[in-house]
Protein backbone atom coordinates (compact mmCIF):
# COMPACT_ATOMS: atom_id res chain seq x y z
CA UNK A 1 0.00 0.00 0.00
CA UNK A 2 2.93 2.32 0.71
CA UNK A 3 4.24 2.03 -2.85
CA UNK A 4 0.75 2.45 -4.31
CA UNK A 5 0.17 5.62 -2.29
CA UNK A 6 3.57 6.93 -3.41
CA UNK A 7 2.73 6.23 -7.07
CA UNK A 8 -0.57 8.12 -6.74
CA UNK A 9 1.15 11.14 -5.14
CA UNK A 10 3.78 11.24 -7.90
CA UNK A 11 1.27 11.13 -10.75
CA UNK A 12 -1.86 12.80 -9.37
CA UNK A 13 -0.97 16.24 -10.80
CA UNK A 14 -0.68 15.05 -14.40
CA UNK A 15 -3.84 12.97 -13.98
CA UNK A 16 -5.79 16.04 -12.86
CA UNK A 17 -6.18 15.15 -9.17
CA UNK A 18 -3.88 17.57 -7.29
CA UNK A 19 -5.80 17.02 -4.05
CA UNK A 20 -4.26 13.55 -3.83
CA UNK A 21 -0.74 14.93 -3.40
CA UNK A 22 -0.95 14.32 0.36
CA UNK A 23 -2.48 10.85 0.12
CA UNK A 24 -1.29 8.32 2.72
CA UNK A 25 -1.35 4.52 2.59
CA UNK A 26 -4.03 4.30 5.30
CA UNK A 27 -6.49 6.14 3.09
CA UNK A 28 -5.64 3.88 0.15
CA UNK A 29 -6.29 0.82 2.31
CA UNK A 30 -9.68 2.13 3.43
CA UNK A 31 -10.78 2.94 -0.13
CA UNK A 32 -9.74 -0.45 -1.49
CA UNK A 33 -11.29 -2.27 1.46
CA UNK A 34 -14.59 -0.48 0.92
CA UNK A 35 -14.82 -1.61 -2.71
CA UNK A 36 -13.39 -5.07 -1.85
CA UNK A 37 -10.29 -4.79 -4.01
CA UNK A 38 -7.15 -6.58 -2.76
CA UNK A 39 -4.28 -5.84 -5.19
CA UNK A 40 -1.74 -7.46 -2.85
CA UNK A 41 -3.35 -10.87 -3.41
CA UNK A 42 -3.35 -13.06 -6.51
CA UNK A 43 -6.03 -15.57 -7.45
CA UNK A 44 -5.37 -18.05 -10.24
CA UNK A 45 -7.66 -19.15 -13.03
CA UNK A 46 -7.34 -21.62 -15.88
CA UNK A 47 -7.94 -20.17 -19.33
CA UNK A 48 -9.75 -22.33 -21.86
CA UNK A 49 -7.20 -23.00 -24.57
CA UNK A 50 -9.11 -25.80 -26.25
CA UNK A 51 -11.24 -24.27 -29.05
CA UNK A 52 -13.47 -27.36 -28.91
CA UNK A 53 -13.92 -27.27 -25.13
CA UNK A 54 -17.71 -26.89 -25.18
CA UNK A 55 -18.16 -29.55 -27.86
CA UNK A 56 -15.96 -32.08 -26.04
CA UNK A 57 -17.65 -31.30 -22.73
CA UNK A 58 -21.03 -31.97 -24.33
CA UNK A 59 -19.73 -35.30 -25.67
CA UNK A 60 -18.71 -36.33 -22.16
CA UNK A 61 -22.03 -35.20 -20.70
CA UNK A 62 -23.83 -37.22 -23.36
CA UNK A 63 -22.10 -40.33 -22.04
CA UNK A 64 -23.23 -39.59 -18.49
CA UNK A 65 -26.75 -39.01 -19.78
CA UNK A 66 -26.67 -42.33 -21.64
CA UNK A 67 -25.66 -44.04 -18.40
CA UNK A 68 -28.61 -42.57 -16.52
CA UNK A 69 -30.95 -43.51 -19.35
CA UNK A 70 -29.66 -47.07 -19.52
CA UNK A 71 -30.01 -47.46 -15.75
CA UNK A 72 -33.69 -46.56 -16.01
CA UNK A 73 -34.31 -49.14 -18.75
CA UNK A 74 -32.34 -52.26 -17.90
CA UNK A 75 -33.21 -54.55 -15.04
CA UNK A 76 -30.75 -55.70 -12.39
CA UNK A 77 -30.10 -59.06 -14.05
CA UNK A 78 -29.95 -57.74 -17.60
CA UNK A 79 -26.59 -57.59 -19.36
CA UNK A 80 -26.09 -54.02 -20.64
CA UNK A 81 -25.08 -53.79 -24.30
CA UNK A 82 -22.46 -51.16 -23.50
CA UNK A 83 -19.91 -50.85 -20.69
CA UNK A 84 -19.36 -47.21 -19.74
CA UNK A 85 -16.00 -46.57 -18.10
CA UNK A 86 -14.29 -43.52 -16.66
CA UNK A 87 -10.51 -43.97 -16.94
CA UNK A 88 -7.35 -42.17 -15.89
CA UNK A 89 -3.89 -42.66 -14.44
CA UNK A 90 -2.55 -41.42 -11.13
CA UNK A 91 1.25 -41.41 -11.47
CA UNK A 92 3.91 -40.70 -8.87
CA UNK A 93 2.33 -42.52 -5.92
CA UNK A 94 5.12 -42.77 -3.37
CA UNK A 95 5.95 -45.89 -1.40
CA UNK A 96 7.00 -44.48 1.98
CA UNK A 97 8.67 -46.45 4.76
CA UNK A 98 8.97 -45.55 8.42
CA UNK A 99 12.51 -45.22 9.78
CA UNK A 100 11.37 -45.55 13.38
CA UNK A 101 8.37 -47.65 14.47
CA UNK A 102 4.99 -46.08 15.18
CA UNK A 103 4.24 -45.76 18.89
CA UNK A 104 0.83 -46.87 20.16
CA UNK A 105 -1.63 -44.60 21.89
CA UNK A 106 -1.28 -44.51 25.69
CA UNK A 107 -4.32 -43.67 27.86
CA UNK A 108 -3.74 -40.49 29.80
CA UNK A 109 -0.54 -39.63 27.88
CA UNK A 110 -0.92 -39.87 24.11
CA UNK A 111 -4.39 -40.08 22.63
CA UNK A 112 -3.17 -40.97 19.15
CA UNK A 113 -0.51 -43.06 17.45
CA UNK A 114 2.85 -41.27 17.41
CA UNK A 115 4.90 -41.32 14.22
CA UNK A 116 8.45 -40.11 13.65
CA UNK A 117 8.75 -37.19 11.24
CA UNK A 118 11.52 -38.82 9.23
CA UNK A 119 10.78 -41.43 6.58
CA UNK A 120 12.36 -43.15 3.60
CA UNK A 121 11.13 -42.97 0.01
CA UNK A 122 11.26 -46.35 -1.69
CA UNK A 123 10.12 -45.26 -5.14
CA UNK A 124 6.91 -44.55 -6.98
CA UNK A 125 4.18 -46.45 -8.79
CA UNK A 126 1.35 -45.47 -11.12
CA UNK A 127 -2.30 -46.33 -10.70
CA UNK A 128 -4.25 -47.13 -13.88
CA UNK A 129 -7.94 -47.37 -13.12
CA UNK A 130 -11.36 -47.53 -14.73
CA UNK A 131 -14.70 -47.17 -12.97
CA UNK A 132 -17.73 -48.91 -14.44
CA UNK A 133 -20.34 -46.17 -14.36
CA UNK A 134 -23.24 -48.63 -14.35
CA UNK A 135 -22.25 -50.76 -11.38
CA UNK A 136 -19.44 -48.86 -9.66
CA UNK A 137 -16.84 -51.60 -10.06
CA UNK A 138 -13.24 -50.36 -10.05
CA UNK A 139 -10.75 -51.97 -12.42
CA UNK A 140 -7.44 -50.94 -10.85
CA UNK A 141 -3.92 -51.89 -11.80
CA UNK A 142 -0.65 -50.77 -10.22
CA UNK A 143 2.26 -50.38 -12.62
CA UNK A 144 5.81 -49.09 -12.30
CA UNK A 145 5.20 -46.70 -15.20
CA UNK A 146 2.30 -45.41 -17.30
CA UNK A 147 3.36 -45.59 -20.92
CA UNK A 148 1.50 -46.90 -23.95
CA UNK A 149 2.45 -50.46 -23.06
CA UNK A 150 0.83 -50.20 -19.63
CA UNK A 151 -2.27 -48.55 -21.07
CA UNK A 152 -2.60 -51.32 -23.66
CA UNK A 153 -2.27 -53.90 -20.89
CA UNK A 154 -5.20 -52.23 -19.15
CA UNK A 155 -7.24 -52.31 -22.36
CA UNK A 156 -6.44 -56.00 -22.80
CA UNK A 157 -7.62 -56.65 -19.26
CA UNK A 158 -10.91 -54.85 -19.95
CA UNK A 159 -11.28 -56.76 -23.21
CA UNK A 160 -10.96 -60.05 -21.33
CA UNK A 161 -13.27 -58.95 -18.51
CA UNK A 162 -16.30 -57.89 -20.57
CA UNK A 163 -18.23 -60.20 -22.87
CA UNK A 164 -17.33 -60.14 -26.55
CA UNK A 165 -20.61 -58.55 -27.65
CA UNK A 166 -20.31 -55.62 -25.21
CA UNK A 167 -19.13 -52.27 -26.54
CA UNK A 168 -16.66 -50.54 -24.19
CA UNK A 169 -17.00 -46.76 -24.04
CA UNK A 170 -14.24 -44.96 -22.15
CA UNK A 171 -14.05 -41.37 -20.95
CA UNK A 172 -10.38 -40.35 -20.75
CA UNK A 173 -8.01 -37.48 -21.48
CA UNK A 174 -5.78 -37.16 -24.53
CA UNK A 175 -2.58 -38.26 -22.80
CA UNK A 176 0.05 -39.29 -25.33
CA UNK A 177 -0.28 -42.96 -24.30
CA UNK A 178 -3.97 -42.90 -25.21
CA UNK A 179 -3.41 -41.73 -28.78
CA UNK A 180 0.00 -43.25 -29.50
CA UNK A 181 0.88 -45.33 -32.54
CA UNK A 182 1.14 -48.42 -30.34
CA UNK A 183 -2.31 -47.86 -28.87
CA UNK A 184 -3.86 -47.30 -32.29
CA UNK A 185 -2.25 -50.49 -33.57
CA UNK A 186 -3.72 -52.47 -30.70
CA UNK A 187 -7.20 -50.98 -31.25
CA UNK A 188 -7.06 -52.22 -34.85
CA UNK A 189 -6.76 -55.78 -33.52
CA UNK A 190 -10.07 -55.41 -31.67
CA UNK A 191 -12.20 -53.41 -34.14
CA UNK A 192 -15.33 -51.73 -32.76
CA UNK A 193 -14.56 -53.01 -29.28
CA UNK A 194 -13.54 -49.68 -27.73
CA UNK A 195 -14.80 -46.14 -28.18
CA UNK A 196 -12.84 -43.28 -26.63
CA UNK A 197 -14.55 -40.06 -25.54
CA UNK A 198 -11.85 -37.51 -24.78
CA UNK A 199 -12.21 -34.77 -22.19
CA UNK A 200 -11.21 -31.28 -23.37
CA UNK A 201 -7.79 -29.86 -22.58
CA UNK A 202 -7.74 -28.73 -18.93
CA UNK A 203 -11.08 -30.51 -18.52
CA UNK A 204 -10.01 -33.43 -16.34
CA UNK A 205 -12.59 -32.28 -13.76
CA UNK A 206 -15.24 -33.61 -16.16
CA UNK A 207 -13.97 -37.15 -15.63
CA UNK A 208 -15.76 -38.90 -12.75
CA UNK A 209 -12.75 -41.00 -11.86
CA UNK A 210 -11.01 -37.87 -10.59
CA UNK A 211 -13.51 -37.97 -7.71
CA UNK A 212 -12.36 -41.50 -6.93
CA UNK A 213 -8.69 -40.48 -7.08
CA UNK A 214 -9.42 -37.61 -4.70
CA UNK A 215 -11.03 -40.06 -2.29
CA UNK A 216 -8.00 -42.36 -2.46
CA UNK A 217 -5.67 -39.45 -1.70
CA UNK A 218 -7.72 -38.32 1.30
CA UNK A 219 -8.15 -41.79 2.79
CA UNK A 220 -6.12 -44.78 1.64
CA UNK A 221 -2.91 -42.93 0.72
CA UNK A 222 -2.99 -40.26 3.41
CA UNK A 223 -1.07 -42.11 6.14
CA UNK A 224 -0.01 -45.38 4.58
CA UNK A 225 3.47 -46.73 5.32
CA UNK A 226 4.99 -49.82 3.70
CA UNK A 227 8.24 -51.75 3.75
CA UNK A 228 8.51 -52.21 -0.01
CA UNK A 229 6.95 -51.21 -3.32
CA UNK A 230 5.60 -54.74 -3.60
CA UNK A 231 3.78 -54.31 -0.30
CA UNK A 232 2.19 -51.09 -1.59
CA UNK A 233 0.97 -52.95 -4.68
CA UNK A 234 -0.50 -55.70 -2.50
CA UNK A 235 -2.22 -53.17 -0.26
CA UNK A 236 -3.78 -51.58 -3.34
CA UNK A 237 -5.05 -54.97 -4.50
CA UNK A 238 -6.66 -55.61 -1.11
CA UNK A 239 -8.18 -52.11 -1.20
CA UNK A 240 -9.73 -52.67 -4.63
CA UNK A 241 -11.14 -56.03 -3.59
CA UNK A 242 -12.74 -54.46 -0.52
CA UNK A 243 -14.39 -51.56 -2.32
CA UNK A 244 -15.63 -53.87 -5.08
CA UNK A 245 -17.45 -55.96 -2.48
CA UNK A 246 -19.72 -52.94 -1.92
CA UNK A 247 -19.15 -50.73 -4.97
CA UNK A 248 -20.28 -47.11 -5.00
CA UNK A 249 -21.94 -45.87 -8.19
CA UNK A 250 -20.66 -42.38 -8.95
CA UNK A 251 -23.20 -40.02 -10.50
CA UNK A 252 -22.62 -36.85 -12.51
CA UNK A 253 -24.99 -33.92 -12.00
CA UNK A 254 -23.38 -30.75 -13.40
CA UNK A 255 -25.31 -29.54 -16.47
CA UNK A 256 -26.80 -32.99 -17.00
CA UNK A 257 -30.32 -31.56 -17.13
CA UNK A 258 -29.29 -29.64 -20.25
CA UNK A 259 -28.60 -32.87 -22.15
CA UNK A 260 -31.59 -34.48 -23.86
CA UNK A 261 -31.33 -37.89 -25.49
CA UNK A 262 -33.77 -40.14 -27.24
CA UNK A 263 -33.53 -43.71 -25.99
CA UNK A 264 -31.57 -45.92 -28.36
CA UNK A 265 -31.77 -48.88 -26.02
CA UNK A 266 -35.52 -49.44 -26.09
CA UNK A 267 -37.21 -51.76 -28.56
CA UNK A 268 -39.58 -49.07 -29.81
Language-model features: where?
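Charge-mixed, compositionally biased segments that are often intrinsically disordered regulatory tracts
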Residues: 2-7, 11-121
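Short, solvent-exposed loop/turn segments at secondary-structure junctions
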Residues: 35-38, 89-93, 133-135, 175-177, ...
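Electropositive, glycine- and tryptophan-enriched low-complexity nucleic-acid-binding patches
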Residues: 106-166
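RNase H-like polynucleotidyl transferase catalytic core
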Residues: 109, 114-119, 188-208, 224-226
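Acidic, metal-coordinating catalytic cores used for nucleic-acid/nucleotide bond scission
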Residues: 146-147, 170-181, 201-206
Amino acid sequence: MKELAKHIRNHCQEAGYPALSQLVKGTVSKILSKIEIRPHKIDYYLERRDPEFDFKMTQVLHVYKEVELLKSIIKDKDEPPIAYLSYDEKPGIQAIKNIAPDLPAVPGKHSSISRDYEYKRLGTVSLLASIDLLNGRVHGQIKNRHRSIEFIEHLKYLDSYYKDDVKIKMILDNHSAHISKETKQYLKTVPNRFEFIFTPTHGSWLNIIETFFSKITRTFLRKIRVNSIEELKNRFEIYFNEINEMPVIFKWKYKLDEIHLQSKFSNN
